[in-house]
Amino acid sequence: LTSEFRHDLDAMQREINDRTRLVVVTNPNNPSGTVVPRADLEQFVASMPDHVTVVVDEAYMDYVKEPAYKGMGDVAVSRPNVLVTRTFSKIYGLPGLRVGYALAVPETLKNFWMYTSFPSSIAIHAATAALEDMDHVAATRQMTWEGRDYLYYELNAMGLSYVRTESNFMLIEVGDAEGITRKLARQNVYVRNADRIWKVGNHIRVSIGTREENQFFITALRQAFA
């Protein structure tokens, strides 16, 4: 990641060699929640040698509020070296069913076919129903946006640094990430130690929940620093 917690596409490009076959870009990024601008991604894809496929994971795209953000689905269905993946596990609320889909040209999909597994009939019916419930998607998106703003306000009041996010989670700089994680757990608040898991020093990753959950988290975080 760059100093702004975005994918360092230049650094990724420098690591590509004759043995490279697959490059994955998660956009929005996990764990930072930041997004790579569409123009930068298009340039990155165009720079790839023919033997490299770029997989763009758009699992969190439905949480993005940035007006300039645009998914890469249209690029994937027109270029043989791009595959876009999306999921029903996030904003659609179906994480246990493990159902998602990919966008690519037919030849690329054929090459990846052997690595796929078929979802159950229950998962298919649930995903179909989820696609028909756009009210849920809109409500969840709005709740997440309001939750972000609330957390930004409270974290600013506490004097804590954080990464502005376009997803349903965010990174917060807390100093002793392991210590704060343990103190929060004692209050039944469970966050991810981003320092230990993703090597993002001194940060925790917290999911953005309902207003009540966010308030509970802020109260616990204040207590952890007391």
Task: Label the predicted regions.
Residues 104, 172-175, 208-210:
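Short beta-strand-to-loop capping motifs
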Residues 7-19, 31-54, 58-91:
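Active-site pre-lysine segment of PLP-dependent enzymes
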Residues 6, 96, 166, 198-202:
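Short acidic/glycine-enriched loop/turn segments that link adjacent beta-strands
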Residues 39, 186-187, 196-226:
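PLP-dependent enzyme catalytic core of the Aspartate aminotransferase-like
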Residues 22-28, 54-58, 163-165:
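Short beta-strands and strand-loop turn motifs
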Residues 81-156, 160-163:
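PLP-dependent aminotransferase class I/II
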Residues 145, 154-187, 204:
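Conserved PLP-binding catalytic core of the aspartate aminotransferase-like
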